[in-house]
From Swiss-Prot:
Region (Alpha C-terminal domain (alpha-CTD)): 261-328
Biological source species: Mycoplasma genitalium (strain ATCC 33530 / DSM 19775 / NCTC 10195 / G37) (Mycoplasmoides genitalium)
Catalytic activity from the UniProt record: RNA(n) + a ribonucleoside 5'-triphosphate = RNA(n+1) + diphosphate
UniProt xrefs under HAMAP family: RNApol_bact_RpoA
UniProt-listed GO biological process terms: DNA-templated transcription
Gene this chain is encoded by: rpoA
Identification of the protein by name: DNA-directed RNA polymerase subunit alpha
GO molecular function terms attached to this record: DNA binding; DNA-directed RNA polymerase activity; protein dimerization activity
Length: 328
């Protein structure tokens, strides 16, 4: 069968000065015509909905029973406080996971991020105390302000997941009064767009140039999210390929002819499966790679000491099998 083009990936090619790991531009080319949209659409859907992340799913504020209330001495009402806490970006260590899922203990033993404010002034995410394995990324996030010296404790419950869960679903995890369930948006990918450009490579040949632009919330690097999306797709498609073992082992993508040629030239003569006598003769004459062999003319080959007619024929046959020629 006709092989598909082997493509290359360039990272941040258009912005060489970009050092923000939360943003990335990824160029994939050359792709067969039509594959830009096929790959782009599949990757975008996975990036926006399937990359795992962490999110706040419940909050407890000392002295507060439900979210539609006020706390004396606090600038914000409870609803505003909840909205602020929902913007927390948290990373959870892989050490707290087993088989890809967080081990979820009862809520009373759940790891809690906690802040206790006692003096008048603003409270930020950096003031949160985190349990082992939890890290707040956006430490400058404003949470609330005390209008006088007083003591207020806020406990924040965070879990790992994919996609989105509503406060109704999260409320099922809560078994005590005074804990307010919230919606949870787990996706660490804030934006993912792609663009496909047609590139004319010959009079009759068009290829696709696919460009992704990805932005994350900092819990995962853009390049890691990009790779994770591809991994998720591959893992879902592999079982389908396994339906037919002969197709499973089929080579679908092939390098360009000139790339294969360059790689062939770099081959050591040990890789060409010559007989011991032929191999030793070539080594003694200072020929170590295929490129060095092809730099010789047929006359040069025949003049190699102790080569013999049989070894000469073996070398000529091997070069012909590779579709290559000696120097004329």
């Amino acid at each position: 069968m006709e092989k598909f083009l082997k493509y290359e990936i360039k990272v941040n090619n258009n912005q060489p000065t970009n050092t923000n790991p939360n943003y990335g531009i990824f160029e994939v080319a050359p792709l067969e015509s039509g594959f830009g949209i096929t790959i782009g659409n599949a990757m975008r859907r996975v990036l926006l909905s399937c990359i795992p992340g962490a999110s706040v799913f419940a909050i407890a504020i000392s002295g507060v029973k439900q979210e539609f209330s006020n706390v004396e001495g606090v600038l914000e009402d409870v609803t505003e406080m909840v909205l602020n806490f929902k913007q927390l970006v948290v990373r959870i260590s892989d050490l707290l996971f087993e088989d890809g899922e967080m081990i979820e203990p009862p809520l009373e033993r759940w790891p809690v991020l906690k802040v206790t404010a006692e003096k008048k002034g603003a409270v930020y995410a950096k003031d949160l105390e985190c349990p082992a394995g939890f890290e707040v990324i956006n430490k400058d996030l404003y949470l609330f302000s005390l209008q006088k010296d007083m003591k207020l404790t806020v406990s924040v419950y965070v879990k790992q997941g994919r996609g989105f869960t509503s406060f109704l679903e999260n409320r099922e995890l809560i078994n005590s009064l005074g804990i307010i369930a919230t919606d949870a948006n787990f996706s660490p990918v804030l934006h993912c767009g792609y663009e496909v450009q047609e590139v004319k490579t010959s009079k009759q040949k068009l290829t696709d140039h696919l460009t992704f632009k990805i932005a994350t919330n900092g819990a995962i690097k853009a390049v890691d999210a990009f790779a994770m999306a591809a991994k998720i797709l591959i893992e879902h498609l592999n079982p389908i390929v396994s339906v037919n073992e002969s197709i499973k082992n089929l080579t679908i993508i092939q390098e360009k002819a000139e790339e294969r040629k360059v790689k062939s030239f770099a081959k050591q003569i040990e890789e060409l499966d010559f007989t011991v006598r032929t191999f030793n003769c070539l080594k003694r004459s200072g020929i170590h790679t295929l490129q060095e062999l092809l730099s010789k003319s047929l006359t040069d080959i025949r003049e190699i000491r102790n080569l013999g007619k049989k070894s000469e024929r073996e070398i000529i046959k091997k070069v012909q099998e590779l579709g290559l020629k000696f120097r004329s």
